[in-house]
C-alpha cells in the first residue's frame, strides 16, 4: 500500500516538473522526431526563470524547421496544450499551434511576473521583459535541434504575440537582430498615447488591465501603485508617467533612429479601443525607416470593451476576426500568419498582401494602402451639456428601436437631412453629409480643426468626439468603430482622429458626434454642470464609390 501511494505521489510530482534537455547537436538528425510538447524553465539574463511550453514538430531524418517564439498579452498566460484557452480562442495560440502542425518548432512562454514565470511585472521594460526575448532565443538556439537557417546564415526565427506580446517583439527586434519575421497583433507605438490620448486615461481599460494583471501575477503588480502611475486613478496621466511609458515604446527608439531589424506582419483593428490602427501605421513607418518590410492587415477586432460600452462581437476584452477576404476567397487569420512565416522563414511564394482592410466583419478591401484623401465640412455649432450628453445612451437602445419600428409605417419618414440633434441627455450629432449611393464607404483618417468653448473653466470644459453615422430610417447615432477622442480643455484643437472603416448606404448621415460623458473614459469627464460648444471644420475620409479605389471589394 505504501509503495502504491508513493508511486502515485511520484507521478503527480513529476507531472508538474520541467524537462531537462541536453545541448542540441549541430549535426543532422540521426533519427526522426515525433510531434510532442514538453514544459521547460528558461533562465533569464538576471538569474530568474521563465516558464515555457515547447512544441516539437514531427521531423524526418535530415529535416530542419524554423522556430516560432510565442507569448501572450497583458495578464495572460501561455498555451500549455493545443486544447486550451490560448490554443483555441486567441489568434496568437491558434497561429502558433497551426505552425507547429505544419512543421515548426514553437516555444510559448509566460512573460515575467505572469503565469509560471518568476520576477515582477515591469511594463515591457527594455532592461527586463525585452531582454527576456533574447534569453528565450539563446535557449532555443542552444537546445532545439535541426533548426532551419536563412540564406544569410541566421537561424529562421519568427515571433508572435498580441498587445503586450506585440510590444515585446517589436522592442526586442530593435535590440536583437536574430528575429526575422514578426507578427505583432494589436500593439502600441506610443504606450502613453494609447493608454491616455491627450493625457486622459482610458479608465475602463485601466480598470480591466489592473484587475487582469493583479490576478495573473498573483497580486504582484505593484507598478500601478507607484507614485508616477497613481495619477491614472484621477483620470489623467502625469508627465512623469507619460515619459516612463514612452521609454517602453517603439516611438522613443524610432525617434532616435533605432529601428526594428526584422520584417513584420502587423495586425490591428479599427474597433480596437486601446491601440487603434494609427499605432500600426506608425509602427509600419518605423520598420520601413529601418529598411525592413512591414505589411498591415487592418481587421475590425482587437481590444474590445464589454457590452454596452462596445457592441458584442465575441470574447470580452480581446477578440480578432476569424477570416479576412484579401482576395477572391476569405482566408482564416491563422492561415494568413503561417503563410507569412512560410514566405519569410522557408522561402515560399508570396501570398500575404501589403495591405488589407476589413470594412466590417463581412466585407474587406485589398488596397495599396489606407486612403489618405478626405473632404472637409464646416461644423457651425455643436452645443451640448456636460456631463449629461451621452451618460445614459445605452439605456436608450430599446427606445430607439421602438421608435424606428413606428416610424417605418409612414412614407417620407426620414426627412431630417442635415438637421443636428441631441446635446441634452443624448450625444450631440451634427450631420454634415448625406450619402447618395449604396457603394460609398468611410475609410481613412478623419481630421478636426475646431475651437472648444464653454461656460466652465478651461480645464473643466472637456468633451469626447468621434465620427457618427445615423443610418437611413434610424434614430440612433452610431459612433463609427466606437472611436472617441478626448478634447481635454477649452481652446483650438487641430488633430487627426483614429482611422475608421465602415460601409455606407444611400440616406445615411455622416457627421461629428460629441459626448459630454463616455463610459470608455469614466473617470475623465468634468462633473461640474456646464455647457460646451464646438465650431470649426471636420474632414471625413469619404470614398465616393468602390470603383474609384485601387482594387475591388472582396466579400468572404
Predicted regions and their residues:
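Glycine/threonine-rich phosphate-binding loop and adjacent beta-strand/alpha-helix elements that clamp
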Residues: 21-24, 36-41, 348-556
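N-terminal cap/lid segment of alpha/beta-hydrolase-fold proteins
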Residues: 25-63
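Short substrate-entry loop that stabilizes the transition state in hydrolases
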Residues: 61-65, 70-102, 107, 112-116, ...
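Accessory cap/linker subdomain of secreted extracellular hydrolases
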Residues: 89-95, 101, 130, 142, ...
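Alpha/beta-hydrolase active-site loop
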Residues: 124-145
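Short beta-strand/loop motif that positions the catalytic acidic residue
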Residues: 260, 266-268
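Short alpha-helix in the alpha/beta-hydrolase fold that links the catalytic acid
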Residues: 276-286
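Catalytic histidine neighborhood in serine/cysteine hydrolases
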Residues: 287-312
